[in-house]
Structures are given as C-alpha cells and as structure tokens.
C-alpha cells in the first residue's frame, strides 16, 4: 500500500522473529521482537546488546516510559535481539505504536513469517498495509471481541476432520507474534500431541541439577509445537503463536477492529 512502512524480520530458528527500530533523535538502533501479545516497549541495557543512552536523544521526553538502570537477571543475555516492542491495545499500557495511530499514519499492520530458516528473508512486518506478494486469495476477517489482546472467538477445534466439541460453549483466541508455540487447553492439546505421536509415556525420568542442564548446544530432537495452558480468567483460551502465524498471513486492523488470515505465500 502507498504510505506503508516495511520492516524486514530475521527468523531465529523458528523461535522468534525480530527487526530493527530507531529510538530518539538521532535514532539509536535496536533489534526487537514485534509482539502483538503485549503493549510495552522493552529495551534492556546489557553488555551483550545495544544500550539506550537517554542523553544522546533530543526527544527523550516525548514518550512516557520507565528506564531500568540495573537488572539482576539475564533474560536477553543470550538472545539475538535487544528487546520487545508491544503491538497490542492500550488496555494493558499505552503502546508506542499508538503514536503512529494518533497521527493518522497507521490504521492496520500485517505479518508474514517465513518458516524456511535457510532463506535470507526471515519475514516482514508492514505498518499501514499488507504485501500482496506474501499471501494468496482473500483474507478471512473476524471481529476483535476484547481490546486487551488481538482476541477473537472460535467455534470449534478439529483434530483431523473430527470435531473435539470442546469449544461448543465458546472459546477465545488471540494471534500472538511474540509466542513461539501454539498454546491451548490441556484437554485438547493432549489429544493433539497424542494424534501426532508426541508423548512421554515410554520415557524414563532422570534428574539433573541446574549446573548440568544449563548449557549451549544444538537441539537433536523434534519438539511438539503445541503446549498446554489452562486460562482461568478468560475461560478456554488459545494463543496462536508463530506456529499458527507462519502458514497464515495475518492482518491486524485497528481501524475496523478486525483480525484477518490468508494463506501465506
């Protein structure tokens, strides 16, 4: 679309997708995950990553935020990205992208996530439109049911061609670009993992100390992309993370409060 801005994304082993932003004037560069499951902007200061220097920006006071100057944990130490930029609603906290919205620059944005980790182009985030090169056919749009996450209702969950009937009373889901896996209620995820042959019933259990299992290495096994999560506050809830968003080009339309899905190309 004319007037749109494209952010190239890097695919980190199908576990996260991140791109570059600039903060301040002149812009200081950071790599962040663009997260539709949160609203805050995190730019941690770490020796292993870029560090935001507030005195180096002439527009330091234009956006309200909290700056942490000391952190005991090392959450981002071994990550390839510097932080997280939230793209959800202001019900959580006022997100940075609302500045673009209030200036009339952006009414929607869209994601394409490449599953092929060997390709140079890891993905694409388009602010203000969508890229026709990365989807086929028309998008199917569903209304946002609650402006906290990009949340919408789903009518059923099928395993193969058979209905589970679990969502007959109604289920909620939200598309979350900051979550690697697809999370859902334990009762259904257990059935899904059993259907695809993922189980631990025949495995022995061996205990390990933190010193033994905290190490850096390549994975040698296949891991199910479905993870169980029972949400008590919102009822049956599905988090459609990158596992879902890779095969489906996803549009987040704030102007019409819709989420759209089309086959990714």
Swiss-Prot record:
Q: Record's Gene Ontology CC terms?
A: endoplasmic reticulum; extracellular region; membrane; protein storage vacuole
Tell me the active site.
35, 176
Localization annotation: Microsome membrane; Protein storage vacuole; Secreted, Cell wall; Secreted, Extracellular space, Extracellular matrix
Is Transmembrane helix found in the keyword set?
no
Q: In which tissues is it expressed?
A: Pistils.
Modification after translation is described as: N-glycosylated.
- What's a single GO MF annotation on this record? aspartic-type endopeptidase activity
One Pfam family this chain carries? Answer: Asp
Uppermost EC category: hydrolase
Activity modulation comment: Inhibited by pepstatin.
Name the Enzyme Commission number(s) assigned to this protein. Answer: 3.4.23.-
Domain named Peptidase A1: which ranges?
A: 1-262
Got any disulfides in this one, which pairs? 167-171
Which PROSITE patterns does this one have?
ASP_PROTEASE (PS00141), PEPTIDASE_A1 (PS51767)
State the superkingdom.
Eukaryota
Q: Quaternary structure?
A: Heterodimer of a light chain and a heavy chain. An intermediate form is produced first, and undergoes proteolytic processing to remove the internal plant-specific insert (PSI) and the propeptide.
Give the similarity note.
Belongs to the peptidase A1 family.
Its biological function?
A: Aspartic protease with a high preference for bonds between hydrophobic residues.
Q: What is this protein called?
A: Cardosin-H
